[in-house]
Amino acid sequence: MRAVITGGTGGIGFAIASHFGKAGYQVVLADLNQQLLQQKTAELSSQGFTADYCVLDVTDQQAIDACARRFPADILVNNAGIQHVARLEDFPPEKWALLLNVMLTGPAMLTRAMLPSMRSNNFGRVINIGSIHAVIASPFKSAYVAAKHGLLGFSKVVALENADKNFTINTICPAYVKTPLVEQQIAAQAKEHNLTEQQVIEQIMLAPMPQKAFIDVSEIAAMAAFLCQDAARHMTAQTLILDGGWTAR
């Protein structure tokens, strides 16, 4: 069983890769930085896992097609993500387009490229890493929220189109996870609001979460692994929310 994971060298992606490696899957890390890919792949291999890598820009259609030809996936994890925070009138159009390309068009085109082999083998699992912002909104994140909301609609359509096969597509939507991307947001918001980083964590990020704790990458990895199991074969087009109670408010 081969799993291709975009954003595979990052916090969430690498946690999923490690979990899948322990489960005996062949893991393919897909990301931009070749040196980091080689380092992380070697780290997986040193633990006895079967691992490889693919240098991939998810906004590059030729690169997407090449990755799918070289590593046709049984399991695809669309995890690559970026962020930009600004009021809409201050949002650079090219930055808006980039966020949509990375987090909506990229997953769509990579899923499109992987579908023929999945359908041919009568097995496919697509796992999108969404966000709490796929189901709620926050100011200054218009492009991110639009992309993540779009991912849910996209997944429902693909689920319907492939319901004749042993194929599922689902989206895991965590609240804030302590990853390098979130660390950057903490620093940026501390500067913008003249707060300490701890104040940003307590007063902004964890304030809406009744459990007052970051989601751990291991929780997301475990949920992704469950979605690949036969026990989840009828779970498709679903939005799985890990938010510490945020959406119960």
Language model regions located:
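Substrate-binding pocket helix/loop in short-chain dehydrogenase/reductase
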Residues: 87-88, 92-100, 126, 205
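C-terminal substrate-recognition "lid" of short-chain dehydrogenase/reductases
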Residues: 115, 123, 210-242, 247
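Active-site helix of classical SDR
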Residues: 111, 147, 155
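Conserved glycine-rich cofactor-binding loop
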Residues: 9-10
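Active-site loop immediately N-terminal to the catalytic Tyr-X3-Lys motif
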Residues: 89, 136-143, 164-165, 212, ...
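Residue(s) in the substrate-gating loop at a strand-loop-helix junction
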Residues: 131
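Short, small/polar-rich loop/turn modules that mediate ligand/substrate recognition or access, typified
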Residues: 163, 168, 235-237
